[in-house]
Amino acid sequence: MTDAISPLTSKDIDTAKPITNDDAIVTQMRTFIDTLKQHNYAYYVLDNPILEDSEYDQLRRSLLELEEEYPDLVQPDSPINQVGDMPLPAFTQVTHDIPMLSLGNVFEYNDLRDFMRRVNDRLSVAQQSPEYEMELKLDGLAVSLKYVHGKFTQAVTRGDGQTGEDITQNAKTIRNMPLWLADAADIELLEVRGEVLMPKAGFERLNRLAAEKEEKTFANPRNAAAGSLRQLDPSVAASRPLAFYAYSVNQGLLDTIDTQSAALAWIKDIGFSVSAVEVVSNPREAQTYYESIIATRADLPFEIDGMVIKVNSLALQQQLGFLSREPRWATAYKFPAETVMTRLHAIDWQVGRTGQITPVGKLEPVKVGGVTVSNVTLHNFGEIQRLDVRAGDMVSVHRAGDVIPKVTRVWHEQRPENSEPVQLPSTCPVCDSPVVLPKDEALARCTGGLFCPAQQQEALIHFVSRRAMDIDGLGASWLISFFEHGLVKTVADIYQLHNHQEELVTLEKLGEKSVQNIISAIEASKHTTLSRFIYALGIRGVGETTAQNLAQQFGDLDALMSASIEKLLLTPDVGAITAELAYKFFRAPHNIEVITALREAGVHWDKVEQVVSEGLPLDGQTWVITGALDSMARDEAKAKLQALGAKVSGSISAKTTALLAGDKAGSKMAKAEKLGVKVVGEEEFLALVGE
């Protein structure tokens, strides 16, 4: 992966020798810089330092003295610039020039063959099966770096793929990330994408130091890397053992390079770290290499969670193109999910935002997929009965990728003799209100409503969440603290926190600057959309899609609040139960009072442009969309259907007019066929909407 390093040491450099001209000064600076960069790579990436700490410090001091004496000769890639800067007030949002798409996944050999077959089917019959390039799927944070005429100018996280956060100041502190590319000085704009990660040895060292200081440790290297990059104070990022590995060139690639493997070889030559690469010709060769990496995975210096397989030819990548969220020419071949056995010591009951009582299994802590798991959701009382799980049982816990761990098996033959079946609690574990399990429902519920502190807290957390009012920086821990200190009881109280700034500052670890940031974020959230506001209210049964449909259907909050059940039922995705729940919600005096207080505090939204469907081609029709579309994102397809008068629902029923099915259509396709619902392909859809 890297060439052997034979660095200079401080003994090889005469730091006391007088320097008499600019060329000699620059030569001396370059000697210091190159040696320090070699050490940084060996220390932070390979965890194999090539200098003693004292030698490193001496070289760094010598370079700093030269730079202070000759500021006009400071080199652009000097590691002196990689120690952190002033704390940032917040991260700026940046739109990617080219979206940073995610990858599809395959999990077994047959999936891999299907992926390669789909690639072949899309290519000309006359073409031979393409070569594929395989890379390690690094388990870190995806980042885009930009260089203008060789000089590093910007680093942006993936974010949602369209927009990310500007982390330039933190990225400058990554020791193996070049700040200057001499071989790219003639390239106007070079964009290199890759993964910021924390090597295993550095992660263990970081956690060991944190434990010694009785500070919080990180769960895994990925969390540590992501948390380090999102520090507002770059000096914190500078103190963390981060590394950057490049995996693509998105702008500025030389015209002479025509394959992905050649592109990675080039960016390695100009100064970037690149993971191992293998070129294969068919599924069997790919599987052989995949299995060889699994066998040696534990010996790698960093965490990986699979392989990335790409069509090697850049021209064929262009020909194959993209789905709405992922390329057709690449996929991630994930490693097998991990399943381990452990003991379930107890079952606790938690209360959710709408009163649902959820059982949580308390496990003997065990490592699954690189993460220590001590809790596992058991979903509901029906699931407990289905599994026949009891406190004291040995259970199998399964985790695949980032999926929440779950119990997949109970080892009944190892059950303790004195075990007893789990009983549904008759009263709420938080407020002692009666618990009910409605007929034909899986979830038991606390009847305490907003009298229940647990429901109050969960309602507050939901209200500020990213997809609701999106109040950045006001996390669950602070909200619970504010609640416990009596500063907020309802969501409307959040908009009165500016009146309690002195009290907020006195709370543990919350300084004036943090308080000011929270107040600013609250103020910024006042301008929202009607659909976000409806979703933020936390009406039972009203998710994001239903909130959007209600906003589109009524166009105005007052019209929605005064709507009858019959009118609510005209909204796509709103059935009898949801209509009744929404109707009762908007007539509860407490809810009316909170909504009024929110509006009086200045929460507002732009007018919703309603679609008048009468007379339009699809008036009266209900459509459902499933799978990935080639020509556009699903939200765009939804908008086009609505523009023609259709209602777009999220679920298939006998009332559905048609199902628009894209690539990888799943269970909705099977349900549509079972119910006799018409299935429309993408070409037919494009003809329908006139494209």
Swiss-Prot record:
One of its GO terms (biological process) is DNA replication. The active site is at residue 137. Zn(2+) binds at residues 428, 431, 446, 452. It catalyses: NAD(+) + (deoxyribonucleotide)n-3'-hydroxyl + 5'-phospho-(deoxyribonucleotide)m = (deoxyribonucleotide)n+m + AMP + beta-nicotinamide D-nucleotide. Pfam families: BRCT, DNA_ligase_aden, DNA_ligase_OB, DNA_ligase_ZBD, HHH_2, HHH_5, Nlig-Ia. It comes from the Bacteria. Its cofactor is Mg(2+); Mn(2+). PROSITE patterns: BRCT, DNA_LIGASE_N1, DNA_LIGASE_N2. Signal peptide: none annotated. It is an enzyme of class 6 (ligase). Transmembrane segments: none annotated. Keywords: DNA damage, DNA repair, DNA replication, Ligase, Magnesium, Manganese, Metal-binding, NAD, Zinc. NAD(+) binds at residues 53-57, 102-103, 135, 158, 195, 310, 334. One of its GO terms (cellular component) is cytosol. Its EC number is 6.5.1.2. GO terms for molecular function: DNA binding; DNA ligase (NAD+) activity; metal ion binding. Residues 613-691 form the BRCT domain. Belongs to the NAD-dependent DNA ligase family. LigA subfamily. PANTHER family: CHROMOSOME TRANSMISSION FIDELITY FACTOR 18 (PTHR23389), DNA LIGASE (PTHR23389:SF9). DNA ligase that catalyzes the formation of phosphodiester linkages between 5'-phosphoryl and 3'-hydroxyl groups in double-stranded DNA using NAD as a coenzyme and as the energy source for the reaction. It is essential for DNA replication and repair of damaged DNA. This is DNA ligase. It comes from Psychrobacter arcticus (strain DSM 17307 / VKM B-2377 / 273-4).
